[in-house]
Amino acid sequence: MTGVQYSLSGLVAVPLPPAEALLLFTPRGEERWVRGWRPRFPMPSDDDCAPGTVFETDTHGERTTWIVVDRQEGRRVCYARVTPGSRAGTVTVTVTDDTRGGSTAEVVYDLTALSPQGARELRGFADGYADHLRSWQVAIAEHLSAPEAMTPG
């Protein structure tokens, strides 16, 4: 047993209405602003956030399998994720109106280490979580300010 589990939560400001902001946190939506994010779908799907949708990513030398567990259209999406032999858990993004024409996305990672190496990876992720979310906010803002950027959808 590794005995390492974290529940990490933080906020990301998005200068879009909630329904549009949530699209940036879908598998294909993240491709627009996350460098190196290339989800692969074993079964083609027009709706990449339909519950039961499975996709894989390869980042930082690791393959992770993701499954859309639940979604509340235009408001929330929840993914289960497993990096074999390393970490497993859920990621939930809930978007609310910030009353200024934009949105606030609450990003919650509930992760458990599956190995000693996974425990080290997870501790490092937890230590840098606030900076990680700040980098997301910057990347989203840069994406949305680019001349060729279109709102998601």
Spans of features found by a protein language model:
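Hydrophobic ligand-binding cavity/cleft-lining segments
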Residues: 1-47
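Intrinsic-disorder/low-complexity, polar/charged segments enriched in Ser/Thr/Lys/Arg/Asp/Glu/Gln
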Residues: 5-13, 54, 63, 76, ...
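A short, structured loop/turn motif at beta-sheet edges
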Residues: 15-19, 69-74, 94-104
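Short acidic, gly/pro-rich beta-turn/loop elements at beta-sheet edges
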Residues: 20-22, 33, 67, 89, ...
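A generic alpha-helix structural signal
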Residues: 22-25, 126, 137
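Glycine-rich portal/gate segments that line the openings of hydrophobic small-molecule binding cavities
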Residues: 29-33, 40-84, 90, 139-143, ...
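Beta-strand/loop substructures that line and gate deep hydrophobic ligand-binding cavities in soluble
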Residues: 82-135, 142, 152
